[in-house]
């Protein structure tokens, strides 16, 4: 299993950060790595990359303004994502951790760097959207 973590302080209050991060049907308006999202149910959604590669997410924990967790699955990997949100006045600290298992042995050496790249891009896009 590969674990990747990113922590960042965002210059926006926790209510805005939470609203944007959990509003998955609007991801394509601010995330540069996605073409669209599809809401399956209250607890499940699918993200499509710009190359139309699908990943299914199943929400497992929602503690408003504190914690969001989900399971992830696609043809290359499965795993679990944990996001914590901490208010500090008009700023919010986010702490996102992914635990991923590659389904194909030849992908294992690349998983950590791929996850880190994805996390960095997500946070960059989020900050650009919220801090504009």
Q: Where do the PLM segments sit?
A:
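Hydrophobic-ligand-binding modules of eukaryotic lipid transfer/binding families
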Residues: 1-9, 57-58, 88-91, 120, ...
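A generic structural signal for alpha-helix starts
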Residues: 12-15, 76, 117
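Hydrophobic alpha-helical core bundles mediating ligand binding, dimerization, or RNAP-core interactions
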Residues: 21, 31, 98, 118-119
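Short coil-to-beta transition motif at edge beta-strands of beta-rich domains
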Residues: 40-46
């Amino acid at each position: 299993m590969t674990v990747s973590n990113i922590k960042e302080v965002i210059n926006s209050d926790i209510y805005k950060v939470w609203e944007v991060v959990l509003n998955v049907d609007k991801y394509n308006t601010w995330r540069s790595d996605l073409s669209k999202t599809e809401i399956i149910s209250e607890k499940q959604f699918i993200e499509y990359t710009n190359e139309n590669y699908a990943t299914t997410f199943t929400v497992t924990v929602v503690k408003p303004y504190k914690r969001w967790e989900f399971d992830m699955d696609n043809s290359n990997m499965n795993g679990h994502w944990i996001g914590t949100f901490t208010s500090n006045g008009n700023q919010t600290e986010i702490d996102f951790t992914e635990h991923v298992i590659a389904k194909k042995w030849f992908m294992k050496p690349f998983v950590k760097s791929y996850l880190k790249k994805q996390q960095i891009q997500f946070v960059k896009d989020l900050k650009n959207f919220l801090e504009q």
